[in-house]
């Protein structure tokens, strides 16, 4: 629609089609000149505007402006006066002509010049009102489609069809009126006019019930429609939900095994762990060609530039120049057979490419494994509509939020520091989201996700946060893969004889939690069970599922959610700490079987070091330690004076700014 083209997403990337020479692409824009509330361009002419925009972007433009009933008048227009009158009228006037009928049009349109007034002197007001617009003339529309389909000059084509909003409702009954979209039903007399206008075979009596009219199966109309659908290889809407299951490598295979044994003393980030897994997948003989890495001009940020030479960057034209870094190992290689989609600085464009790949199993019967990696702050916050659409379209693939965590991406300020993408991900019912800390967690989640989506064919897609902070990754004797997928597992335990607490953490803040456990043990004699929570979102969803089952089956024994089973029977209060808003961890409070304290990063980001940011947002090891001591004191298991001593010991200023409001 012409009104919808005010959305940046509608026209913002049309030059791409011109650059890619997509001469099989045809847009049809219904130019009825109206939005919901009023004219699209009341003071100008929207079709002329669109013509300029599309021609400038390298498109063919076909304008279907006037119907056949105007042709006799055009034949009379020897001096171009009618053409002049049409060119000078603005869209707000054209809306009036249709809304107010033939007499109004005779006076205000044709009546401006004697020559045009004379052209219609033999036409009745009804004849003038019936002068049709091109988009409602099947002959003109067919001619436009024929030209569009048969034009093969390497350019995409747009058809601008001039129409009337509420066409068929009748003058005075909603046609071309500003309130056309709000007319919920038509009066009986208006229905009769509609019936007569379009030749619908219903009697006056039948019309009173406003029946749904469908032509007979052997009617010319339905025969034609069925024939055309056969020529187009099927009917719409249609959704292919089943496809040939893929065999996903196991955790023992090379792509994942390299990340299961820790970092062997090296300090790496979870981003690096993810990229290594991705590199392993693209080298897989079975799956490699189906993997689609997608980046919005951030490949070097995430250490993915090695894929430029290895896989090539897709471009329709190949590479007509020698890149400036050709002498380097990881040079910028563009190729017609490239596999990396380098979309430039457009998260909406990159997300759209991801959706196309993530729905290819259904739309094209070709299963692809898309991985879209980007700055996490520029994900759901920027392209939330598209992420919601991806859920609706049953997309399957991975969205990977890089440089995640409000205090982990240091030095880039509030516009870049993400403390809420996981909360936004939780709003999409079929989006499974995780915030891993260690490489083995990343490996387990990616492998499980691939299996769920492409072997088991579950209707879901994944959001995975990865960070840019380097640290050593542990090697676990037995990686609890099932618990990692469920959202929570016991990482380690520390000893203490003066009390015990349960410490939960996710992402990079889990490492602050681990450090806090050492402080509690060494400084206060407090022991701790340390839990890695890979997904508070998954914990909550499972708990809600079981809660519903219990509600609907009151006579059956209720199953306990994973978070409850993990913490049940464990000593001490529970303290959860994350690099996200407190709401993220707080969402499981109802199923935590103990006193529950949540630390998080509510508030705007700041540009500073990680150490100072974590102090500012009150999620560093010292705040975790004091929160644990305070929780014990509230239970009467610790002298409250020790909480004050801890604040002094760790240099925590009671008068520091509140991160939520400062």
Model-derived regions, located:
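Short acidic, Gly/Ser-rich segments with clustered Asp/Glu that frequently serve as metal-coordination loops
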Residues: 3-9
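Conserved catalytic-core segments centered on acid/base and nucleophilic motifs
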Residues: 3, 351, 357, 502-504
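Short intrinsically disordered, low-complexity coil segments enriched in acidic
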Residues: 1-3, 310
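Thiamine diphosphate
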Residues: 11-474, 481-482, ...
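Short glycine-rich or small-residue beta-strand-to-loop segments that form or flank ligand, phosphate
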Residues: 1, 339-342, 370-374, 500-505, ...
């Amino acid at each position: 629609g012409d009104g919808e083209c005010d959305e940046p997403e509608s026209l913002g990337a049309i030059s791409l089609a011109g650059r890619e020479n997509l001469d099989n692409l045809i847009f049809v824009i219904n130019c009825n000149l109206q939005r919901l509330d009023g004219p699209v361009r009341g003071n100008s002419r929207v079709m002329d505007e669109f013509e300029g925009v599309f021609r400038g972007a390298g498109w063919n433009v076909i304008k279907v402006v006037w119907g056949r009933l105007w042709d006799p008048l055009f034949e009379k227009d020897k001096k171009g006066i009618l053409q002049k009158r049409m060119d000078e009228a603005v869209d707000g006037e054209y809306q009036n002509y249709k809304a107010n009928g033939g007499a109004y049009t005779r006076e205000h349109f044709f009546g401006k010049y004697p020559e045009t007034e004379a052209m219609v002197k033999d036409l009745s007001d009804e004849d003038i009102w019936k002068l049709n617009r091109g988009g409602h003339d099947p002959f003109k529309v067919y001619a436009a489609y024929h030209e569009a389909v048969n034009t093969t000059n390497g350019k995409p084509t747009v058809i601008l069809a001039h129409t009337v909003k509420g066409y068929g409702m009748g003058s005075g009954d909603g046609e071309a009126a500003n309130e056309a979209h709000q007319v919920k039903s038509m009066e009986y007399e208006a229905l009769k006019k509609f019936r007569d206008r379009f030749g619908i075979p219903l009697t006056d009596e039948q019309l009173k019930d406003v029946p749904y009219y469908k032509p007979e199966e052997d009617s010319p109309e339905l025969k034609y429609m069925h024939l055309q659908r056969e020529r187009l290889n099927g009917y719409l809407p249609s959704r292919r939900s089943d496809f040939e299951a893929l065999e996903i490598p196991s955790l023992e295979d090379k792509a994942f095994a390299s990340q299961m044994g820790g970092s062997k003393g090296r300090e790496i980030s979870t981003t690096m762990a993810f990229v290594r897994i991705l590199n392993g997948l693209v080298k897989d003989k079975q799956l490699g060609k189906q993997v689609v890495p997608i980046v919005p001009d951030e490949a070097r940020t995430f250490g993915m530039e090695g894929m430029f030479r290895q896989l090539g960057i897709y471009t329709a034209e190949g590479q007509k120049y020698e890149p400036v870094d050709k002498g380097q190992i990881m040079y910028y290689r563009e190729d017609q057979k490239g596999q990396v989609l380098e979309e430039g600085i457009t998260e909406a464009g990159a997300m759209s490419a991801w959706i196309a790949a993530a729905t290819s199993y259904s739309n094209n019967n070709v299963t692809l494994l898309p991985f879209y990696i980007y700055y996490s702050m520029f994900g759901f916050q920027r392209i939330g509509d598209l992420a919601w659409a991806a859920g609706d379209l049953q997309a399957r693939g991975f969205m990977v939020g890089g440089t995640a965590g409000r205090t982990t991406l240091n030095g880039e300020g509030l516009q870049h520091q993400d403390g809420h993408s996981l909360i936004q991900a939780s709003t999409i019912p079929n989006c499974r989201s995780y915030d891993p800390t260690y490489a083995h967690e990343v490996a387990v989640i990616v492998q499980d996700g691939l299996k769920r989506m492409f072997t088991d064919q579950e209707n879901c897609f994944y959001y995975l946060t990865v960070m840019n902070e380097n640290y050593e990754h542990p090697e676990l004797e037995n990686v609890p893969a099932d618990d990692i997928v469920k959202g929570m597992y016991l990482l380690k335990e520390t000893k203490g004889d003066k009390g015990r607490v349960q410490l939960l953490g996710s992402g990079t803040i889990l490492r602050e939690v681990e450090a806090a456990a050492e402080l509690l043990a060494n400084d206060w004699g407090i022991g701790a069970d340390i839990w890695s929570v890979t997904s508070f979102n998954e914990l909550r969803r499972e708990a809600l599922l079981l809660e519903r089952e219990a509600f609907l089956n009151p006579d059956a024994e209720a199953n306990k959610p994973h978070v409850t089973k993990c913490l049940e029977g464990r000593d001490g209060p529970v303290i959860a700490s994350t690099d996200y808003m407190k709401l993220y961890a707080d969402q499981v409070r109802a199923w935590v079987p103990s006193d529950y304290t949540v630390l998080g990063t509510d508030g705007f980001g700041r540009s500073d070091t990680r150490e100072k940011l974590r102090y500012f947002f009150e999620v560093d090891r010292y705040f975790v330690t004091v929160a644990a001591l305070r929780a014990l004191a509230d239970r009467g298991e610790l002298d409250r004076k020790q909480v004050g001593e801890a604040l002094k010991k760790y240099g925590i200023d009671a008068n520091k700014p509140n991160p939520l409001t400062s």
